[in-house]
Amino acid sequence: DYTCPQNYAAYTSADHETYSRLYKRQSALLPGLACDEFIAALPSLGLSERIPRFEDINSTLFKATGWEVVAVPGLIPEVPFFTLLANRKFPVTDWIRKPEEFDYIVEPALSNVPVWLLELVLSPGFPDHLQAYGAGGLKAHRLGACEQLSRLYWYTIEFGLMRQRGGIRAYGAGILSSAGELTYGVKSAEPQRTMLVVLR
């Protein structure tokens, strides 16, 4: 299933510093840019500026949602990914971004673990939605429809925006973990923001 242990002892002081810098910067940027549910969930897991231990996070996360984070070595194939989601396990690479990747990275690295964890506790329906998405992904794979499901995932869970009373707000993990994407996606007049119509 591609999961592996989190080798916490392997993290260097530079890794902890990178994580701390990212955590502090993103925490300061979130008010007014992140959705209300995300802001409300911030204190729920007691995350800090230190690299989190998965077992510590999971003890809280599992009680709240029935989910847990599992370490994987990198991007994994569709079937193992969807299987993990269907079993309420979210795969996260256990490595820290390099300084040159500080503002954006393609893979769900440990650097945006807080984002994913908070996504899972945003609302009572989200944990079940993500599990159903995993089950749906397995069905889509059998039907040869993974491309469509991947697109939906990309524009919602990864880069989703929503309209709230205060205006456009971010809820996608890829946006919330990147300073540039967060400000651009929510505040800039340049992006073309299209209302999601699932059947389109």
Predicted segments, located by residue:
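Short secondary-structure junctions and interdomain/linker hinges
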Residues: A64-V72, P124, G136-A140, F159-R163
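C-terminal structured domains
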Residues: A173-R200
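The feature captures two recurrent sequence modes
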Residues: D1-V121
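Extended, Lys/Arg-enriched charged tracts that mediate electrostatic binding to polyanionic substrates
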Residues: A140-A173, S177-G180
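Short, hydrophobic/amphipathic alpha-helical patches that form generic packing surfaces
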Residues: S59-K63, W116, Q131-A135, R151-L161
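Short, intrinsically disordered, charge-balanced linker/junction segments flanking boundaries
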Residues: L117, V121-P124, L196-R200
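A long, hydrophobic alpha-helical segment
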Residues: F126-C146
